[in-house]
């Protein structure tokens, strides 16, 4: 018989830097999950990812206090800021532009985010990422 799911925990954890301090410790502790086991497994799974890059993770907690987790791709906004070389997006995106991205950069981000995007083909995914870039005040060359 399959294990009964007790709940889900959604977190954004820096790659390779999971530790028992907040927000990870309290979120897992409330459900009775072994915090150090999660930290070790997560850090091992994110060894090949750039250290410090925030990785969204969905932790499934079972009623016997065991867990599994699914890692998603980094948020598009983080990847866009990194590609444009900026610290933060524009506060008035329709007036003030803070950077510029080429189609090649957008394609690279779209292929990175491919598992999490719903676009049918690469062009549709690029348009999705371009929309996110425009809403951050980045100029897009398509």
UniProtKB/Swiss-Prot annotation:
GO terms for cellular component: cytosolic large ribosomal subunit. One of its GO terms (molecular function) is large ribosomal subunit rRNA binding. One or more lysine residues are methylated. InterPro entries: Ribosomal_uL11, Ribosomal_uL11_bac-typ, Ribosomal_uL11_C, Ribosomal_uL11_C_sf, Ribosomal_uL11_CS, Ribosomal_uL11_N, Ribosomal_uL11_N_sf. SUPFAM superfamilies: Ribosomal L11/L12e N-terminal domain, Ribosomal protein L11, C-terminal domain. Keywords: Methylation, Ribonucleoprotein, Ribosomal protein, RNA-binding, rRNA-binding. The keyword RNA-binding applies. PROSITE patterns: RIBOSOMAL_L11. The keyword DNA-binding does not apply. GO terms for biological process: translation. Forms part of the ribosomal stalk which helps the ribosome interact with GTP-bound translation factors. Belongs to the universal ribosomal protein uL11 family. Part of the ribosomal stalk of the 50S ribosomal subunit. Interacts with L10 and the large rRNA to form the base of the stalk. L10 forms an elongated spine to which L12 dimers bind in a sequential fashion forming a multimeric L10(L12)X complex. This is Large ribosomal subunit protein uL11. It comes from Acinetobacter baumannii (strain ATCC 17978 / DSM 105126 / CIP 53.77 / LMG 1025 / NCDC KC755 / 5377).
